[in-house]
């Protein structure tokens, strides 16, 4: 397995800090959390069950359909785009390595072990990363963070004291907007100044003059 890790760090050539976090943190057990700079954490993502995340293929198809132009652009779009690019590249290198190992290892048990490790362990981490950054680009980072916190609270609450259904990410923006509207004080548009009328005293003096 050490040979597998060595091959992975060599094959996964990562030019950016974000991608280096992915490789170094996973391979050598360093305390590096690729979600911290985005306000989340691995622990926060771990509240979501593994079957919550779509397959890598579905996530890659979603990223391609929604953000292909931005991902292929040489311009820097956002940190989420950069992280998404590197996660996609890393997964491609992992697949190449798994294919190479599967073709060159003579022992079927070892070959199956390596392929299974890539698909299960690394596959889940890639699925989490892809889902997080695609969701942040689609719904906004604050909404995704609110969803992760809401789901974490829901899943840790005993079934007898929580709603039957888990929170749904796609419904959070609407709820959030309604709640924010309720909090914000109603702004009153200033009315144009009216011309001040004459004081009663002045009007009274004018009436006396007219009587005279």
Swiss-Prot record:
InterPro entries: Hepatitis_B_virus_capsid_N, Hepatitis_core, Viral_capsid_core_dom_sf_HBV. One of its GO terms (molecular function) is RNA binding. Residues 1-19 form the signal peptide. Residues 178-205 have a biased composition (Basic residues). It is found in: Secreted; Host nucleus. May regulate immune response to the intracellular capsid in acting as a T-cell tolerogen, by having an immunoregulatory effect which prevents destruction of infected cells by cytotoxic T-cells. This immune regulation may predispose to chronicity during perinatal infections and prevent severe liver injury during adult infections. This is External core antigen. It comes from Hepatitis B virus genotype B/C subtype adw (isolate Okinawa/pODW282/1998).
């Amino acid at each position: 397995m050490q040979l597998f890790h060595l091959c992975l760090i060599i094959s996964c050539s990562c030019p950016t800090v974000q991608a280096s976090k992915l490789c170094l943190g996973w391979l050598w057990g360093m305390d590096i959390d690729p979600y911290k700079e985005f306000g989340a954490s691995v622990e926060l993502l771990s509240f979501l069950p593994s079957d919550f995340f779509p397959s890598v293929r579905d996530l890659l198809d979603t990223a391609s359909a929604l953000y292909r132009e931005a991902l292929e652009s040489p311009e820097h779009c956002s940190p989420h785009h950069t992280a998404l690019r590197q996660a996609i590249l890393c997964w491609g290198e992992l697949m190449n390595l798994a294919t190479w190992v599967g073709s060159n290892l003579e022992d079927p048990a070892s070959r199956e072990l390596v392929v299974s490790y890539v698909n299960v362990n690394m596959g889940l981490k890639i699925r989490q990363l892809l889902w997080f950054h695609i969701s942040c680009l689609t719904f906004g980072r604050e909404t995704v963070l609110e969803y992760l916190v809401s789901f974490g609270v829901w899943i840790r609450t005993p079934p007898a004291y929580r709603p039957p259904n888990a929170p749904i990410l796609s419904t959070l923006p609407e709820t959030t907007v309604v709640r924010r509207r309720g909090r914000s004080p109603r702004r009153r548009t200033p009315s144009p100044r009216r011309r001040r009328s004459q004081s009663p005293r002045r009007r009274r003096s004018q009436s006396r003059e007219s009587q005279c």
